[in-house]
């Protein structure tokens, strides 16, 4: 199984599929189609039914039930796009077999080293086979490891018809990394009772709580005048923006928060004297605190208007997704079952809140409860990204055993 996982992830990772938040199309980038078409062909060759890709790049397929009694239809999803934070062009995955510990030189000429000194969790992977980057790109295990695990699990079930399972629906989706993964997802057409995203991180992650999320763009308008004659005339939009940022709570930022603590994250700053734009993401697990964060943003904008003039500042803010716990709690057995499966495989479930979101965050509010399962990866979205092939195999086994367990329970 490991050989198949390596082969698939190597192939998928080399296909550039970065999304683009500035685009208005779905998928946001044409290159996502390259992997979508590859997967469509692969699923057809495996012998799945109902293999269809719609005009927006959502690829659906079915593994029919192999039992003669009713079992819930279960979905498994992963996203084809990779993050925009770091380049995903010309990905060249490296394989470290039977990692012996210590530093991993990703790129000697650029002196890029993956070291336990910087990433102490590496010490827990001694003896594992790791797939890393070459130090110049991200790897894309988020979420191509999830794709590889789903396809490999389905291939295994097809080769082992003695393993009982109900109907399985598969979906590979675009644009998750820019928050639009489910925007054009047809839940009725997918037709599953519930689903799981294979989009988590280290071994054992099992998540059904996510952030409430909003995005905000604050635009400041200045007045540019030659510096030599600027007294009492120039208004520097960058200084207006800096003062605005400094009014937000300094300790409520990603680098100073953890667990259930929310934050304001300034993730874009672009400007000159005449015009400056700040891009924020706003996050909190608690709905009331989330609303309070948005209210603070609106309050500060109002203050700036009163102090500097209506024309000096604009705010665009919109909700992106909500904490899926509210929709999953009523069907919590879909989480508990996977936790039981993990324990049966000797994996300790790590049921923790996601400090982020998955496609499941939105899908759960669209009527498809969708918790999130680990894939085995670490350090997503950068050149130090890597994945344990051993833990990819365990994630694949979790898929297989989850389907077996639901089939057995339906028979009881």
Swiss-Prot record:
Catalysed reactions listed for this entry: Release of the N-terminal residue from a tripeptide
Keywords recorded for this protein, A-Z: Aminopeptidase, Cytoplasm, Hydrolase, Metal-binding, Metalloprotease, Protease, Zinc
Keyword Protease: yes
Catalytic activity, EC: 3.4.11.4
Residue sites binding Zn(2+) 1 per the record: 79, 142, 199
Free-text cofactor note: Binds 2 Zn(2+) ions per subunit.
Family classification: Belongs to the peptidase M20B family.
Protein name stated in the entry: Peptidase T
Species lineage: Bacteria, Bacillati, Bacillota, Bacilli, Bacillales
């Amino acid at each position: 199984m490991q050989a198949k996982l390596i082969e698939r992830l190597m192939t998928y990772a080399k296909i550039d599929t970065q999304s683009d938040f500035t685009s208005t199309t779905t998928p946001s980038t044409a290159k996502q189609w390259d992997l979508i078409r590859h997967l469509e062909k692969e699923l057809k060759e495996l012998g799945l039914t109902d293999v269809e890709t719609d005009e927006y790049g959502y690829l659906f397929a079915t593994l029919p039930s192999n039992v003669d009694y009713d079992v819930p239809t279960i979905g498994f999803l992963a996203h084809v796009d990779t993050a925009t934070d770091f380049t995903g062009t010309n990905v060249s995955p490296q394989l470290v077999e039977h990692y012996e510990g210590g530093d991993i030189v990703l790129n000697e000429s650029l002196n890029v080293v993956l070291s336990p000194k910087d990433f102490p969790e590496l010490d827990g992977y001694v003896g594992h086979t790791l797939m890393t980057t070459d130090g110049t790109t991200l790897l894309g295990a988020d979420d191509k490891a999830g794709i590889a695990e789903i396809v490999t699990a389905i291939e295994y079930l097809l080769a082992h018809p003695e393993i009982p399972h109900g109907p399985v629906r598969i979906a590979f989706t675009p644009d998750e990394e820019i928050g639009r993964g489910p925007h054009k997802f047809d839940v009725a057409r997918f037709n599953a009772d519930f689903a799981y995203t294979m989009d988590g991180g280290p071994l054992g992650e099992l998540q059904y709580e996510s952030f409430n999320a909003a995005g905000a763009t604050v635009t400041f308008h200045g007045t540019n005048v030659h510096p030599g004659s600027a007294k009492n005339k120039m208004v520097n939009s960058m200084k207006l923006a800096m003062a605005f940022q400094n009014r937000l709570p300094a300790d409520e930022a990603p680098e100073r928060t953890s667990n259930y603590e929310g934050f304001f994250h300034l993730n874009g700053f672009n400007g000159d004297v005449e015009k400056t734009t700040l891009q924020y993401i706003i996050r909190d697990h608690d709905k009331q605190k989330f609303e309070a964060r948005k209210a603070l943003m609106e309050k500060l904008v109002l203050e700036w208007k009163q102090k500097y003039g209506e024309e000096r500042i604009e705010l665009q803010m919109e909700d992106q997704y909500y904490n899926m716990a509210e929709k999953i709690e009523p069907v919590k057995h879909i989480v508990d079952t996977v936790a039981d499966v993990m324990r049966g495989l000797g994996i300790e479930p790590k049921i923790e809140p996601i400090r982020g979101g998955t496609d499941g965050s939105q899908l759960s509010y669209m009527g498809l409860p969708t918790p999130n399962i680990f894939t085995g990866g670490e350090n997503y979205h950068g050149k130090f990204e890597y994945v344990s092939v051993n833990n990819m195999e365990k994630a694949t086994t979790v898929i297989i055993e989850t389907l077996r367990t639901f089939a057995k329970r339906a028979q009881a």
